[in-house]
Curated annotation (Swiss-Prot):
May have a potential role in hypercalcemia of malignancy. This is Leydig cell tumor 10 kDa protein homolog. The lineage of its organism: Eukaryota, Metazoa, Chordata, Craniata, Vertebrata. Belongs to the UPF0390 family. InterPro entries: UPF0390. Residues 25-39 have a biased composition (Basic residues). Residues 7-18 have a biased composition (Low complexity). Residues 1-40 are annotated as: Disordered. It holds the Pfam family DUF2462.
Length: 94
């Protein structure tokens, strides 16, 4: 047996968020370790910006193609955020 008392007793987290974080357990999926070398960081930043640009260009091309073939004007809708979905007035949670 160990001698003496433990220095720090285990305590419950003070906030609900911290308690939920602790009880959640391990997350699914692989982990990516951020690179330390400046050149690799710069390459990843460039890659990400290029991917975003390519995705936006493809979306724009699809919208233009669809709007040119439709008789009525095409309107794009933004996806609702999680907070606005939870607090829609007049709707009851089911």
């Amino acid at each position: 047996m160990a001698q003496g008392q433990r220095k720090f007793q285990a305590q419950k987290p003070k906030s609900k968020a911290a308690a939920a974080e602790r009880s959640r357990g391990p997350r699914k999926g692989g982990r990516v370790i951020a690179p330390k070398k400046a050149r690799v960081v710069q390459q990843q930043k460039l890659k990400k910006s290029l991917e975003v640009g390519i995705r936006k260009k493809i979306e724009h091309d699809v919208v233009m193609k669809a709007s040119s073939s439709l008789p009525k004007r095409l309107a794009l809708l933004k996806g609702a955020s999680k907070k606005s979905e939870a607090t829609i007035p007049g709707k009851t949670p089911s």
